[in-house]
Amino acid sequence: MSIRSHEQYALLTDYDTGSAYSEAYHTVFANIRFSWESDSTPQHTLLLATPSPYTEQAGVVANVAIVAAQSGTSTILVDADLRTPSLQQRFSLGKSSGLSELLAEESITPEKVAASLCKTFIPNLRLLGAGDTTRGGASLLLSSKLETIINCLRNLAAEAETSRGLVIFHSPPVLSGADASLISAQVEQTFLTMVAGRTTRVQVKQAQEQLQRSHAKLVGSILLDV
């Protein structure tokens, strides 16, 4: 799957639905959806991660989530990049509690997770932002609490009126630490995004090996800037 270079930083809502930019993301989502439509589970979880730092990665994940929501899928987008969060700003949402605060809770309940979700201006799309990342230490709690949070998010997606639900995670780069690997071990599918001319074969190989050690289900890739 590929997306040509055309301001990946911008949200799809800034473009005409018939534009090549928009069509590229619809093609990407169609391929993602094809990979899980045969699954009997109506709620699906996935991670889109890049091997090395890429500033437009958050925009790529946001646009895939937008297409999913526009297709009628109840979609929850999670900003799990607790180092450089940006999704709340991209959707023009004010500061609010998010993933960092949930990870700091002694007991995580569906009610607490639901209260942390923000509605976006796009129907069917809600955001769990990174929250206040200045407190530090949140990443250390991912391994012990992420499974509970994902189960709550899955159930919240199931409560929507649409027939299918999707939870999409945005994470730090795979090779920058353990966060992406921890998330990939908990979600059903992981896709690697690679940037032509920037992402090297060595980085891709190292990222694949790291994800495989986490028992991630790596099912595909997205090529940017071709």
Named regions from a protein language model:
Residues 2-26, 30, 37-45, 51-54, ...:
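P-loop/Walker-type NTP enzyme "switch/lid" segment
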Residues 32, 52, 132, 171-173, ...:
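Short, well-ordered turn and helix-capping elements at secondary-structure junctions
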Residues 60:
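Hydrophobic positions on the alpha1 helix immediately C-terminal to the Walker A/P-loop
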Residues 63-64, 138:
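Short amphipathic alpha-helix
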Residues 68:
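Aromatic pocket-lining residues of Rossmann-like dinucleotide-binding sites
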Residues 139-226:
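Conserved catalytic-core segment of NTP-binding enzymes
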